[in-house]
Amino acid sequence: MAEPGGAAGRSHPEDGSASEGEKEGNNESHMVSPPEKDDGQKGEEAVGSTEHPEEVTTQAEAAIEEGEVETEGEAAVEGEEEAVSYGDAESEEEYYYTETSSPEGQISAADTTYPYFSPPQELPGEEAYDSVSGEAGLQGFQQEATGPPESRERRVTSPEPSHGVLGPSEQMGQVTSGPAVGRLTGSTEEPQGQVLPMGVQHRFRLSHGSDIESSDLEEFVSQEPVIPPGVPDAHPREGDLPVFQDQIQQPSTEEGAMAERVESEGSDEEAEDEGSQLVVLDPDHPLMVRFQAALKNYLNRQIEKLKLDLQELVVATKQSRAQRQELGVNLYEVQQHLVHLQKLLEKSHDRHAMASSERRQKEEELQAARALYTKTCAAANEERKKLAALQTEMENLALHLFYMQNIDQDMRDDIRVMTQVVKKAETERIRAEIEKKKQDLYVDQLTTRAQQLEEDIALFEAQYLAQAEDTRILRKAVSEACTEIDAISVEKRRIMQQWASSLVGMKHRDEAHRAVLEALRGCQHQAKSTDGEIEAYKKSIMKEEEKNEKLASILNRTETEATLLQKLTTQCLTKQVALQSQFNTYRLTLQDTEDALSQDQLEQMILTEELQAIRQAIQGELELRRKTDAAIREKLQEHMTSNKTTKYFNQLILRLQKEKTNMMTHLSKINGDIAQTTLDITHTSSRLDAHQKTLVELDQDVKKVNELITNSQSEISRRTILIERKQGLINFLNKQLERMVSELGGEEVGPLELEIKRLSKLIDEHDGKAVQAQVTWLRLQQEMVKVTQEQEEQLASLDASKKELHIMEQKKLRVESKIEQEKKEQKEIEHHMKDLDNDLKKLNMLMNKNRCSSEELEQNNRVTENEFVRSLKASERETIKMQDKLNQLSEEKATLLNQLVEAEHQIMLWEKKIQLAKEMRSSVDSEIGQTEIRAMKGEIHRMKVRLGQLLKQQEKMIRAMELAVARRETVTTQAEGQRKMDRKALTRTDFHHKQLELRRKIRDVRKATDECTKTVLELEETQRNVSSSLLEKQEKLSVIQADFDTLEADLTRLGALKRQNLSEIVALQTRLKHLQAVKEGRYVFLFRSKQSLVLERQRLDKRLALIATILDRVRDEYPQFQEALHKVSQMIANKLESPGPS
């Protein structure tokens, strides 16, 4: 079937089949701005697309009744819809409208199609037009216009009537116009069977269509489209413009007049249909391609993102499960090891209990041994007189000393090993505890992480389901949520401000309430005092009114005393206020001093513990020093001939001297710290005592002032009563005097004369008693002299017996101390040997473990360094690739801009050529029907302007749809970020619940503060008790410290004496052995000749001189060791001064 000439001249490729240029245009639309994208898309699609025309049949009558015409030229064939795509440049230029220039020279575009059928003879200007176009230089244009013969033959229409292709408005969603319908109805009245020649029609449409394309491009690039409020979201694309433009042909004069009448009839209907029709595009519509592509890309990105997140979550869950299983296994092993350690701890407790019981038994045995020692003291005194017994005992002791020295050396080694083993066990225990805590913390972290991952999985599933919802509903939900969040945040701020203001108000109210209560108490106290004074004054006034005139002087005196007492009361009140303020300050200082005292007590306890440890270390070092001195003497006596031993001993002496200096300096520092702490404690305790005394004195002063006020008030009332009583007594005594005088007959004997007589009698009696007392005193003095003589004799005998007893007790104590020291040394040596063996074993194990751990750490460090370098190189490669891509994109953008500029330049050239062709055409055409042609041109111009506006609106709406997709992505990302920041939006009910919980917590905190105040008061009482007990213990400690210092001095003195005696005993024993060997003839001379003996003597003297110089140098460098080295240097000097053998 032939193709109609005006309606649907060409159809576009089906199923979106396009060339590679079209695909590149679609792909590049994401990287450039919308104007650049549209122009580039036009150019590439025009060059690369292929053309596949189809024949379409339409129903013109149904379209005329509905009054709608397709603006994009889409054909609906019996309810079926076809996909629309772009044609190449040849078909695009053939489909454009014919265009005429207005008197002002403006170029306009038409909105609707005009299917006219005119015979070939109605176009008289065909040859002239062809010659003009050829002379104007339109060679490239004619090459495009003259296509292959197959394409031109397809454009020849059939004799059947052809109309514009129409379709229902509900399916296609396009806006129709009234004039188009009128022209279409007018075209149906033309005779059928008229066909326009192919070549003329083709060339005519080609020239004007290119002009339309250039004008549309200039309008699109220069202006920014504005979306009117009544236009729907979908508009036809510019790429579909050739479908409309293919339907316009050159009308005849009769057809022009008919079209003008139809336009006048339908101009009123166009305005009504523009705002009333709501356009809804079908999903398969070609205008929806860009929006669907953007939405598809967005959804694909979301799906890929969710897939990656899901894969990461699956991998993380697998790893967490594996780690959890491994942690369970490790936890079980650690628990088993902990049970084993607990068993070992119980066994060690049992061993400790057994050792304590054995110690008690040994102490009991020691007491029994002491009892036996008292019995054997008498026998020991008798045996001392025997020289042979003493010699045998000396030999045994020397042998024992030799053995003990060897054992001592072994025990020292064992002690070192045991200390190292103990340290190792302690470190292993601490490390096991730390590892257990870390494992518990890691298990908790993994559980929380697993829960969080499960929540994230559920959240991602919900997000995946929510992606299918509509964008409009999501936007509304987000806006509502934002408004709710803003309202909640505003309400939260308001409530927090109210809460802060209420707290401040409560504080001010409490302060004002306290001030009012204090003022009320003061006023009540003053009112009571004034009431008491008023009542007292009323009573005194009533009594004074009842008295007579004789007591007026007494009344004046009492009034003056009352005024004085008032002054005293006011002074006492002022003193009381001042003392109350002082009391508060003292109480605060007392609290500060108590806090400082508690801190000092803690520091004192720590320092006492350190002091005990240092003293123990000092004792150990002293014992080591003694043993090393003895070893040095023995080594000097035994190995006088070896030079290596002398060097070793010199090094040993230097090392011991350094250790001794370090220990002495450390001891002096600790003693200084202890003295400083004791001074601080005494200072704080003295301050505390002074504050307590002042507090007690102030309390007593307050009590005294109150008692003085009450006593003064009672004294006033008591004195008034006493005055009355004395007045009555005076009257009574006057009456008695008168009566006595009357009885004596008028002679008055005074009471003094009677008293003189009575006293004279008493004097006589006392004189007699004094004589008797003198006699008895003399007798008692004689007896007392005899008793004192006897007492002096008894005291002399008692002193002699005490001296004898003291001597015996000292002897007893000396022997007991020697026995106890020997036993203690033996036990310590055995214990040290065992400990040193264990320490040596543990030390070896620790060294092996440390070596293995260090190797593992080095390997791990190497692996981590390699991984870090590898990741760094990969990231550098990625950055280089991204930089290259960015450079490529910038170059492509620049090339596209250059192509766009060139295309615009070509468009301007074509416009000039078209203008020349139009001028030639206007000169060729006749003047018949110029009025109708001008009217038609005006209408065409108006429709072209309308078409440009609609195309701009269409492009604007397509961009809005694409931006909506992008906006949706931004909204989802913002929602995800907000959801991560705040998982749960706070509502009014949640806020109310939280407020109730906070109030409940505040009540609990207040209760807790009350309980804390009670406990603080109790602790203060206990602190006072503890401070008093601490003072007592400090006094006891000072006494014990003094005793300890004296005992330590005695111990050092006795130790030096013991070492001296032992050295003398060893020397005497060796001398005795040599003498016995000489006596028996077994002695072997070391030096056979006298000359060798002299040489050996000289060598030894040189070595002694060298040792003496070394000792002098050490004494100069280390003055703290002068006392210890003085004896050694003195012995060496004596040896050097002694003459050699003759």
Swiss-Prot record:
Stretches with biased composition (Acidic residues): 63-96, 265-274
Compartment(s) of residence: Cytoplasm; Cell projection, Cilium
InterPro entries in UniProt: CCDC40 (IPR037386)
Region: Disordered, residue numbers: 1-197, 251-274
GO cellular component, one term: extracellular region
Bias (Basic and acidic residues) ranges: 11-27, 35-55
Annotated coiled-coil segments of the chain: 293-319, 349-470, 526-627, 684-950, 1005-1054
Phosphoserine carried by residues: 252
Biological process according to GO: axonemal dynein complex assembly; axoneme assembly; cilium movement; determination of digestive tract left/right asymmetry; determination of liver left/right asymmetry; determination of pancreatic left/right asymmetry; epithelial cilium movement involved in determination of left/right asymmetry; epithelial cilium movement involved in extracellular fluid movement
Keywords: Cell projection, Ciliopathy, Cilium, Coiled coil, Cytoplasm, Kartagener syndrome, Phosphoprotein, Primary ciliary dyskinesia
Record disease entry: Ciliary dyskinesia, primary, 15: A disorder characterized by abnormalities of motile cilia. Respiratory infections leading to chronic inflammation and bronchiectasis are recurrent, due to defects in the respiratory cilia; reduced fertility is often observed in male patients due to abnormalities of sperm tails. Half of the patients exhibit randomization of left-right body asymmetry and situs inversus, due to dysfunction of monocilia at the embryonic node. Primary ciliary dyskinesia associated with situs inversus is referred to as Kartagener syndrome.
General function of this protein: Required for assembly of dynein regulatory complex (DRC) and inner dynein arm (IDA) complexes, which are responsible for ciliary beat regulation, thereby playing a central role in motility in cilia and flagella. Probably acts together with CCDC39 to form a molecular ruler that determines the 96 nanometer (nm) repeat length and arrangements of components in cilia and flagella. Not required for outer dynein arm complexes assembly. Required for axonemal recruitment of CCDC39.
Protein name: Coiled-coil domain-containing protein 40
Originating species: Homo sapiens
